[in-house]
Amino acid sequence: MSKVILVTGISSGFGKKIAEFLSQKGHAVYGTIRTDCSVAPNVRVLKMDLTDVTSIKNAVNTVIREEGHIDVLINNAGMHLGGPIEEAPVELFTRQMNANFNGLVHIIQAALPHMRANGGGTIINFSSIGGLMGLPFQPFYSSSKFAIEGLSEALRMELKPFNIRVVVINPGDFHTSNTTNRINITVPGGPYEEQFKKSIAIIGKDETGGWEPEILARKICKIVDKRNPRNRYIIASFEQKLAVVLKKILPIGLFSKILESHYGIK
């Protein structure tokens, strides 16, 4: 059955492939972008900035005006900031939280009245493996994803009476534009520079050696079609799934040593 789906952040990576694959399956797909770019021909493009509440409301209202309802909201859009906590400019980590978390809250708030009126629906929130464990030199990215985890847990319970399901997606390392688009900050000659360069090189290698975004997009298409999707889908390599399990069962000090070793921290 065809559904009306709103996907945020379709200019590249996950969002672009998700919108493309969903439209190929016959769904009415609306996708948001900040700047002009090429997208699949059957996707309705909406200009939206996650840091601009008015643009968020306008995007949702456009879908409602043209389709009458929203069946599925996929919150994929965001940004990625890398660098040590001490040296992060306040405007950048504020921008990180505004884009990844506050913007997600605003679009959920805008869509929910319409989803309730429609008798239900599905909200798919993109977290990350970094939303299940703090990652060195990605502290604000991890923080924004941890916030999405907590929000989704609470939201799931609040929306149960309205037949609105909340699904969290935890991608592992994927080969997307996230690596080149990440904003990396460190003070030249500062106390973190050497370690940051070493760790961020490892992070970049993990990402460029990761899976292609088509794998995740196909999984999202299957989730959209499910009547009762699971609360969480960890879409990652065996090693990354194992890390999630190990964090739950190991003492935090021992688990931290494993991460420190992986990221070359001594």
Q: What do the predicted segments below correspond to?
A:
Residues K160-E207:
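C-terminal beta-strand-loop-alpha-helix "lid" module of Rossmann-like NAD(P)-dependent dehydrogenases
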